[in-house]
Amino acid sequence: MFQIIYRSKDNISFSEKELKRLLIRSRFRNGADGITGVLLLHEGMFLQALEGDEAAVKATFARIGLDSRHSEVCILGSGARSGEHRNFGKLAMGFVNAGDRTQLLSGFVEIPDVPDFSKLNVLAAMELLRWASERTSRMPAEALD
């Protein structure tokens, strides 16, 4: 099992429609590649964890790095882990928009104080991503699709 945790800046201020399109495509592609993970959006910054086969995760991350919708891509942590345990279960792309209070309310999510992603270390990032993944699975389908 291989994992990458990174942050990046949103260059285009995704509309809700653009975010949904991105998530649908990402979930399809990640599912086909056996990749799981979660994406958290807050104040124009993304925080994401990807996990799965090393080659598939690295290829996905390389594609993300070339995407002009992102900048300031910074790996917070990466590496192989022993065993097949996944931190994000079966989530091909869990997602929480921490700035969207209506999404959070519709999923009965209480949001903690979300720190500036540029100041997170890998342990704090992982804790925040686990928090997001726990909330993703409880959100209604219409908030995720």
Predicted regions and their residues:
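Charge-rich, low-complexity N-terminal segments
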Residues: 1-145
